[in-house]
Amino acid sequence: TPLVEALLRAQGYVFAPEPFSPFCRRLLAEPRPLGSSLAAFFGYIYIQDRSSMLPPLALNPAPGAAVLDMCASPGSKTGLLAQLVGREGLVLGNEPARPRLANLRRNLAALNLLQAVTCSWPGESLPLPDASWDAVLLDPPCSGWGTTDKNPQAIKRWQGDRLKPMLELQRKLLTEASRLLRPGGKLVYSTCTTNVDENEGQVRFAVEGLGLEPIPLEPFPGFVFAAPELPGCEGTLRVDEDASNAQGFYIALLRKPGDSAAVPGLARGTAATAAYRAIPPAFLAEFGLSPALLPPGDLAVFEDSLHFLPAPALAHLPAAVRWQGMALGKASAQGLIPSVRLRALLDPEPQRIPRLDVDDV
């Protein structure tokens, strides 16, 4: 947005638009590491390799859609998906590895994405109903052969018998993704490896073994793509890392056959998260926050933390799923201490908020 670009320029950063998405910019010069910028601190930007932006753009979920990100941490793809579905939609970011879950939640909270919720389950056995998601992004654990600039030992490390459990896990995850996808729904399978067994080989498994239909992808401008390495995988994208000045990446778009009519969500009341104490939205106004900026949903206190629970999640997720909405701050009997990065609910009447003009300091 113009505000974010102005904030970056004010700190001396130079950047240019990327041709493949209006959401993306390429950094050209930085007076200090971009991660230390105000724009990064307040979650206006997310720093990532340009290739990793492509899977959510290839999935391209509709506004208001229900989207599952099966292996979500650190959250860059989850965040972009949440931007695409908007505040009326839902993105569930599942991170099977508990140590990585905190990082996912921290990043999504910094981005102020109220429509994104998180959980932690084995990706191959999620406690979710069949055919319940409009779109699924599966970016599974992989050998990382496309990241040799950062991980030079990746190709040497992941060979032969050591790779077999990874291939088996990827197929289990694809099978689960197919189960969860509604008829007519779309699946993006992506990896940051150049290994054909993990890429084209798995796409052929999805088509021949699971009955999914390939959807040819149009090449994204600004990238160079190598030809797929197996027949039947035409229309999948293999990023040429050297020619594209980006990580090696593979992206395939698949569709589940059947009627494309949306599968209705669960009736409210049949879905729930852990027991919580509901808080009236007007509570926020006492702390310079605007309840009117909340999308439909509930405010809830879990122990000493105030979270937002979006209505689509309350309606869509069954009771068996333990999930968490975005943390807004710390709550106690004395009131609320909003998160220092919370901007999604800032009062639109700024004169009501105490402030310090740094130009006068």
Residue ranges of predicted features:
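S-adenosyl-L-methionine
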Residues: 94-130, 138
